[in-house]
Amino acid sequence: MAATALSSQVRLPMSLRVATAPAPARVSVLPASNKLGDRLRMQATYNVKLITPDGEVELQVPDDVYILDQAEEEGIDLPYSCRAGSCSSCAGKVVSGEIDQSDQSFLDDDQVAAGWVLTCHAYPKSDVVIETHKEDDLI
């Protein structure tokens, strides 16, 4: 056999091919270990601006981390109680951007459509601006 076997005809296994998708704010490639070996997974990180009674604060939130959890990690004091998406203590109002709060069970469809959010069960899906400390306005 000649040494010409390696050429442009070599195909990568499906696990090594890169799929194209719309570019989020930031993308990180993180190793994820499992029993079958190491794999790579894409993780988007978004700019989240929180408008609190004490002023505005901005943070970077990965798309698989709840906004409340990341705020606490960065020392930002936000209200919460159940941390299960079943009360209104952490309620806020989305001013702009997209979030995924499909895990919560307190807000009804009309409230979600009106922009209400429970930060304890909200993932960013784009850059987002949220007014916090809004429980009294919701009830």
UniProtKB/Swiss-Prot annotation:
It is found in: Plastid, Chloroplast. Binds 1 [2Fe-2S] cluster. InterPro entries: 2Fe-2S_ferredoxin-like_sf, 2Fe-2S_ferredoxin-type, 2Fe2S_fd_BS, Beta-grasp_dom_sf, Fd_pln. CDD domains: fer2. One of its GO terms (biological process) is electron transport chain. Keywords: 2Fe-2S, Chloroplast, Electron transport, Iron, Iron-sulfur, Metal-binding, Plastid, Transit peptide, Transport. Ferredoxins are iron-sulfur proteins that transfer electrons in a wide variety of metabolic reactions. Belongs to the 2Fe2S plant-type ferredoxin family. This is Ferredoxin-1, chloroplastic. It comes from Oryza sativa subsp. indica (Rice). The gene is ADI1.
